[in-house]
Design a protein with these regions (language model features):
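Bacterial N-terminal signal peptides that target proteins for export
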Residues: 2-13
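Bacterial N-terminal signal peptides
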Residues: 11-21
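Bacterial Sec-dependent N-terminal signal peptides
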Residues: 19-49, 117-120
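Solvent-exposed, low-complexity, repeat-rich "mucin-like" stalks and linkers
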Residues: 49-87
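Extracellular/surface recognition and adhesion modules
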Residues: 55, 77, 110-112, 123, ...
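Serine/threonine-rich, repeat-prone extracellular segments and beta-strand-based repeat modules
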Residues: 61, 85-121
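Structural signature of tandem-repeat unit edges
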Residues: 139-153, 162-175, 184-197, 207-221, ...
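Consensus positions within tandem repeat domains that build extended binding/scaffold surfaces
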Residues: 156-158, 178-180, 200-202, 223-226, ...
Length: 397
């Protein structure tokens, strides 16, 4: 009897311990469940049927090079369902039909199909090939080309000799190589804001090019021979520009006016030699005007200055013969940062009758004003500049 009671007590104790253990586990599980994030609800409820959809935003890429695959990045589509709700819809390439980049196409209709409903948009396949961001081939026979945004650089001679009227350069393009449009029939080029570098001779012999608007680019240098013999009537330069290379505008017979951006410090050798430019605006901060920068510009009538002065360069100089052979020049302002006026600066000019020498000028070299028509000179500095023999040779008495 005693043994039976003992067994019953043992069983009861075991049951109590088991119950406590289960309760503890249950509590821990409840706490664990509280820590879990709530289960996400499906974006489309079961049973809701698509009635129609709209294309809210086209893909970022709508212009393709030959051989490129469809890219739906940026595409936004909204579906309307029979429960009265609108939801975003993800579109996969397998839901696209009509796309092919095997041949050029001005307008190619691409169709999205979702649950039997369809919407279309238009893409373009340019007559070019691109490999690793480099333009590798341009097909002939096209008057106008818009480059796809996969192009990062245009190599040397890419459009050399091409019979083409207009090229739209894509956003994302960084550089253009030597002689890229040399001797082509290009009439118009649209430049992107991302352009950072040009190499030499790009528009050499481009007689039909009338305007070059580089103002949105990030160029810091306009390289040598950029527009030699080009037909440009207007060139707009970017505020980021610091240097204009040698002969950049040599023999530009249609160019009439040019404003040099305020950050430009250097104007290279013979930059505007034998150009038909009539008016020029120079920044006061320019520190180097190389030899013959405006040599034999037969129509040049006015050179004026503007902007801030940067006078920290003791060698800032207008080099020899910079404005020689400009018979119509009647007004010439010397940039205020200049320290040295070179030999033959205005040699032979008879129309400039008044000249102001800025305060920063410390030296005027031999025959700087040889045989000119200057009648009045104003020196702004308290200390007259150093002069050499025959600086004023040819001045009227």
């Amino acid at each position: 009897m005693k043994q039976t009671k003992l067994n019953i007590l043992i069983v009861l104790c075991l049951q109590m311990m088991t119950g406590l253990t289960l309760l503890s586990c249950s509590t821990e599980n409840d706490e664990f469940k509280k820590e879990l994030p709530p289960t996400e609800q499906p974006s489309e409820p079961t049973g809701a049927l698509l009635e129609r959809f709209s294309i809210d935003q086209l893909p970022a890429k709508t212009i393709y090079a030959l051989g490129e695959s469809i890219d739906l990045t940026g595409l936004k589509v909204t579906g309307e369902y029979d429960d009265g709700k609108q939801r975003s819809v993800n579109v996969a390439p397998k839901q696209i039909s009509g796309f092919s980049s095997s041949v050029p196409a001005d307008k190619q209709e691409v169709t999205i199909t979702i649950e039997g409903k369809q919407k279309s948009f238009t893409i373009q396949v340019a007559p070019v090939r691109v490999e690793n961001g480099v333009l590798t081939e341009v097909l002939k026979g096209y008057d106008e080309i818009i480059l796809p945004n996969s192009v990062k650089s245009i190599p040397k001679n890419a459009f050399n000799g091409s019979k083409i009227n207009k090229v739209t350069l894509n956003e994302g393009l960084k550089s253009i190589g030597d002689m890229a449009f040399f001797n082509s029939t290009i009439q118009e080029v649209i430049f992107p804001s991302t352009l950072e570098q040009l190499e030499e001779n790009i528009f050499y012999y481009c007689y039909h090019l009338k305007k070059a608007d580089l103002s949105r680019t990030k160029l810091t240098k306009l390289p040598a021979s950029t527009f030699v013999y080009a037909g440009v009537e207007e060139v707009l330069l970017p505020a980021t520009l610091k240097e204009i290379g040698a002969q950049a505008f040599l023999k530009t017979s249609q160019l009439k006016t040019i404003e040099i951006p305020e950050n430009v410090k250097t104007i290279g050798l013979e930059t505007f030699r034998e150009s038909s430019v009539t008016t020029v605006k120079l920044p006061n901060g320019v520190t180097t005007m190389a030899q013959r920068a405006f040599y034999y510009c037969p129509e040049l009538a006015e050179v004026t200055t503007y902007g801030s002065t940067f006078n920290d360069d003791p060698e800032a100089m207008i080099h020899p013969y910079c404005l020689e052979g400009c018979p119509k020049l009647a007004r010439f302002e010397i940039p205020e940062s200049i320290r040295i006026l070179g030999q033959g600066l205005l040699g032979g000019n008879r129309k400039v009758t008044q000249l102001t020498i800025p305060a920063n000028v410390t030296q005027i070299n031999f025959s700087a004003f040889n045989n000119t028509g200057i009648k009045e000179v104003k020196v702004e500095g308290t200390t007259p500049p150093q002069v050499f023999e025959k600086v004023w040779y040819g001045f009227p008495d």
